[in-house]
Structures are given as structure tokens and as C-alpha cells.
Amino acid sequence: MALARLALRNLQQKLSPSLMGQSCERGLVGNRHNPMKLNRFMATSAGEQEDKMNTEVSVSEKKSPRQNFPRRRGRKSLWRNTDDHGYFTPTLNEFFPPTIGNTLIQATENMNRIFDNFNVNPFQLMGQVKEQDDCYKLRYEVPGLTKEDVKITVNDGILTIKGDHKAEEEKGSPEEDEYWSSKSYGYYNTSLSLPDDAKVEDIKAELKNGVLNLVIPRTEKPKKNVQEISVE
């Protein structure tokens, strides 16, 4: 009996619990002379399987750090960037009544159309643009610059505005105890592509109180001949 137990223990150490459970169960079922040994090893195998199941359950119940700290969902934004030009496109009218939402959408589309005509990005255009039936109006703030400091050129459909201003002021004299010298420098440079319907030769510019205004006339579009056809 002792030799049999020793042999089975050695077998148990060499084989995996699942394989040992199957081999022991098959061998002991065929041995009818020792039912006590069968019950003992069946109990041992069942106990090992129960311990293994408990271990697996404890591992499966372990939560990952992401579950302990769930990811926050981002808030919905009223404006989102949906194209390659960087234009703002409004979302659906879920934040405003239909009338206000439609007005915002229409205003955004008009601004995007103006930027398309001038081939510029809203963030690159440091000024204001107005589109009228007969002209375009541009407005730039150039504080510290005079009309002598500003130079406007058009080359191959590109409008360029440059401004350069330097000033030096001295107060007092070297002989006095207090002598002050101050320098100021201003620089402005921007370029944009003119629309196809712009009249380059008729562009006018005016600088007043640090504000530069440009008026770009537009060519008249031919009127479309619309003919109504009666339905019989």
C-alpha cells in the first residue's frame, strides 16, 4: 500500500492536474479491489479542480486600471472643423431653434464662399471682408503706420500689403542729468489671391486713423436670359 501511494505521488508531480485526473480516474475505475483508494483520489482531484476554479475566478474579477478610471467622453462642440481649409461648419440645429440655426448656417456658408474667392484661410486673413454686388471691401488695422509707410502691390493676381515704420524719440540732452531715448518699430505684411472677377486697375486704398480700407470693384456678370415655358 505504501509503495502504491509513493508511486502515485510521483506520478502526480510529473503530470498536469487535468491529465492526472483523467489517468487516475480511468485506472481507479478499473480497480474494483480497492474502493477506498478510488474515493481518496477522486476527492483529491476534485479538491485540486476546485482550487483551480477559485483562482481563475479571482483573476477574472480583477478590474483593469481603465475600468477603475473610466474615460471621459468629450463634450459636443457647436462648431467643428470638417474640411481641409479649416472652415468652421455648424452641426445640426440641436442647440438652437430652426430659425436661428438656419441663420448661423447661412452666415457661415457666406463667409466660407468669400474665403474661397480670395483663396485664403480665415486664420491667415488678419482683417475684415465684405462682399457686395459691385465690389469687395477689405479692412485692416495697421496702428502706427502712415500712408507713406504702406506699400500695396498686385502681382499675377496676388495682392500684397506691406508696412514698415521706424521712429526714434529723444528727450533731454546729454549735458542734463536725465536723458531719454526711445525707439519704436512697426511692421505689417499680408498677401491674398484676388478673385477672378476683381478689377485690378480700379482698386482704391485709403488709410485713416490706423485703419486701411481697400475697395476692389467687380466685373459685371452677364445677365442670364431666363425664359419661362408654359405647360400645356
From Swiss-Prot:
GO terms for cellular component: mitochondrion. It is found in: Mitochondrion. Residues 1-42 form a transit peptide. One of its GO terms (biological process) is response to heat. This is 26.5 kDa heat shock protein, mitochondrial. PANTHER family: 26.5 KDA HEAT SHOCK PROTEIN, MITOCHONDRIAL (PTHR46733:SF3). Residues 69-78 have a biased composition (Basic residues). Belongs to the small heat shock protein (HSP20) family. It comes from Arabidopsis thaliana (Mouse-ear cress). Residues 44-82 are annotated as: Disordered.
